[in-house]
């Protein structure tokens, strides 16, 4: 199972964003004014400013996540979000565990439901590990031996995004039409934010959620899966109520 954890974020992120926003409107703005920004100031000003669509201020707050146990299929989609920073486990220097297929690869649930197909998958994955190991034993460097490994191999990655990019990421990847693995990573990232009392308000104020939450309607139109709008909104609401 993929593990996601919020490792670090801008100290006082909502105060930082509010303080930055007020430079445009407040004659009394100063560097020192940051220390005077209270939670009450945040609650008064930030929702109003965001309601005007002034979202560039969200870029002043950044969040760093660790993601472990997802496949390279997932991270290949993740790094398409270009306004972010990524550092991923290297297959050049980290040797793949050749002993355990299920510990080394992500196998979709759809495959696990078909016992005959699952057996074939495991045999092929095991064979790829054997060839990987054999290549290294024959003197092939890991950077070349890794070419035999499929995209399902598990990986680890550190991701840093600013709050505005996170909103864009959530809009696309929390949607039911997103691929299942990156969708679950996105929901776990959102949950990591919701767990923290000082961060939770920004989820509603900035509408951190799928696009149906952000826009108030589903932009996928005829591509929308049946019942998706209701399910997604309920999942988002339940997440907020949980914490």
UniProtKB/Swiss-Prot annotation:
InterPro entries linked: Thymidylate_synthase_ThyX (IPR003669), Thymidylate_synthase_ThyX_sf (IPR036098)
The protein's Enzyme Commission number: 2.1.1.148
Binding site for FAD: 56, 80-82, 88, 162-164, 168
Annotated catalytic residues: 173
Enzyme class: transferase
Residue interval(s) of motif ThyX motif: 80-90
Catalysis performed (reactions): dUMP + (6R)-5,10-methylene-5,6,7,8-tetrahydrofolate + NADPH + H(+) = dTMP + (6S)-5,6,7,8-tetrahydrofolate + NADP(+)
Keyword flag NADP: yes
GO molecular function: flavin adenine dinucleotide binding; NADPH binding; thymidylate synthase (FAD) activity; thymidylate synthase activity
Pfam families from the UniProt entry: Thy1 (PF02511)
Binding site for dUMP: 77-80, 88-92, 146, 173
Pathway info: Pyrimidine metabolism; dTTP biosynthesis
Cofactors, names only: FAD
Cofactor annotation comment: Binds 4 FAD per tetramer. Each FAD binding site is formed by three monomers.
Keyword set, alphabetical order: FAD, Flavoprotein, Methyltransferase, NADP, Nucleotide biosynthesis, Transferase
BP terms from Gene Ontology: dTMP biosynthetic process; dTTP biosynthetic process; methylation
Quaternary organization: Homotetramer.
Family under the similarity heading: Belongs to the thymidylate synthase ThyX family.
Function: Catalyzes the reductive methylation of 2'-deoxyuridine-5'-monophosphate (dUMP) to 2'-deoxythymidine-5'-monophosphate (dTMP) while utilizing 5,10-methylenetetrahydrofolate (mTHF) as the methyl donor, and NADPH and FADH(2) as the reductant.
Protein known as: Flavin-dependent thymidylate synthase
Organism: Pyrococcus horikoshii (strain ATCC 700860 / DSM 12428 / JCM 9974 / NBRC 100139 / OT-3)
Upper taxonomic lineage: Archaea, Methanobacteriati, Methanobacteriota, Thermococci, Thermococcales
């Amino acid at each position: 199972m993929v593990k996601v954890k919020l490792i670090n974020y801008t100290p006082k992120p909502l105060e930082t964003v509010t303080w930055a926003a007020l430079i445009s409107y407040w004659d009394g703005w100063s560097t020192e004014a940051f220390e005077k920004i209270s939670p009450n100031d945040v609650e008064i000003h930030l929702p109003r400013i965001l309601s005007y669509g002034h979202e560039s201020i969200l870029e002043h707050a950044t969040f760093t996540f660790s993601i472990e146990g997802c496949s390279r299929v997932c991270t290949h989609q993740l790094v398409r979000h270009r306004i972010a920073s990524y550092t991923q486990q290297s297959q050049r220097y980290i040797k793949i565990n050749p002993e355990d297929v299920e510990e080394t690869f992500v196998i979709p649930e759809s495959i696990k439901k078909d016992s005959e197909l699952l057996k074939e998958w495991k045999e092929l994955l095991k064979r790829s590990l054997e060839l990987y190991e054999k290549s290294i034993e024959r003197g092939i460097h890991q950077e070349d031996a890794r070419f035999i490994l499929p995209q399902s191999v598990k990986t680890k990655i550190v991701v840093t995004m600013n709050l505005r990019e996170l909103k864009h990421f959530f809009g696309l990847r929390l949607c039911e039409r997103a691929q299942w693995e990156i969708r679950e990573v996105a929901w776990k990232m959102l949950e990591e934010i919701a767990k923290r009392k000082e961060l939770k308000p920004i989820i509603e104020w900035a509408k951190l959620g799928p696009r149906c939450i952000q826009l108030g309607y589903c932009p996928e139109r005829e591509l929308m899966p049946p019942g998706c709008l209701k399910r997604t909104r309920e999942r988002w609401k339940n997440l907020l109520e949980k914490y």
